[in-house]
Amino acid sequence: MKLSLSPPPYADAPVVVLISGLGGSGSYWLPQLAVLEQEYQVVCYDQRGTGNNPDTLAEDYSIAQMAAELHQALVAAGIERYAVVGHALGALVGMQLALDYPASVTVLVSVNGWLRINAHTRRCFQVREQLLHSGGAQAWVAAQPLFLYPADWMAARAPRLEAEDALALAHFQGKNNLLRRLNALKRADFSHHADRIRCPVQIICASDDLLVPTACSSELHAALPDSQKMVMRYGGHACNVTDPETFNALLLNGLASLLHHREAAL
């Protein structure tokens, strides 16, 4: 699996791995790259079955497989210890990595994540699946911003959204791959295992997230032994895109604090 690695800003700089959500594209993290690359070696990638890592996914494709293939690619690139920043599905992959490779994951940041899918989130995905089945990729892509962004943010950026739609259609991961990745997301359940995660965790959520209620992050915080929760008042599901200034400050401060906390504990 192809990875994109930034040059380390200094010798032995900590590594931060960015894992996007259901869309799977590493470019989702563009608003974070410039600030992160000043302090860390940053790893981005298109998830298997998407973008520049095309593949046909099995029907039983799982979050555990997503975690294993990423860890194997990191080890092949010479990276054995790393912090993980995951958004939604990416946060699930991050938790799986922390469970399966505890010696490798130094810190976990969960952005609008959850222990197991909430009934409201499931309802949102049911609607989106119906759109996909009835209207194809175009209907899926057209509806996607409604679940990602606040209304006023979208209204002020119509040309940008049109360009994003065209790009998303051009690089659509395919109906079968999308549904198999979505099914993996829906099956994931960390409610009985989260307390085994021993690395420090930063939880970031947005109070106006239409797709994932903030209660999901509260449940995460209660279940994870060494976690802290930060709530953004604005930003929607893709709060790192819509309000990068606020998000980046939370992320940078959280990573610095938790990595120091981890080193002090060793």
Swiss-Prot record:
Coiled coil feature spans: none
Keyword Hydrolase: yes
Record GO terms (molecular function): hydrolase activity, acting on carbon-nitrogen (but not peptide) bonds, in linear amides
Hydrolase among keywords: yes
Keywords: Hydrolase
Superkingdom of the organism of origin: Bacteria
EC number: 3.5.1.-
Single Gene Ontology BP annotation: uracil catabolic process
InterPro entries per UniProt: AB_hydrolase_1 (IPR000073), AB_hydrolase_fold (IPR029058), AB_hydrolase_sf (IPR050266), Pyrimidine_utilisation_RutD (IPR019913)
Reaction catalysed by this enzyme: carbamate + 2 H(+) = NH4(+) + CO2
Xref: Pfam families: Abhydrolase_1
Gene3D superfamilies reported in the protein's UniProt record: alpha/beta hydrolase (3.40.50.1820)
Family statement drawn from the similarity comment of this UniProt entry: Belongs to the AB hydrolase superfamily. Hydrolase RutD family.
HAMAP family in alphabetical order: RutD
Function field: Involved in pyrimidine catabolism. May facilitate the hydrolysis of carbamate, a reaction that can also occur spontaneously.
Name of the featured protein: Putative carbamate hydrolase RutD
Annotated organism of origin: Escherichia coli O7:K1 (strain IAI39 / ExPEC)
Species lineage: Bacteria, Pseudomonadati, Pseudomonadota, Gammaproteobacteria, Enterobacterales
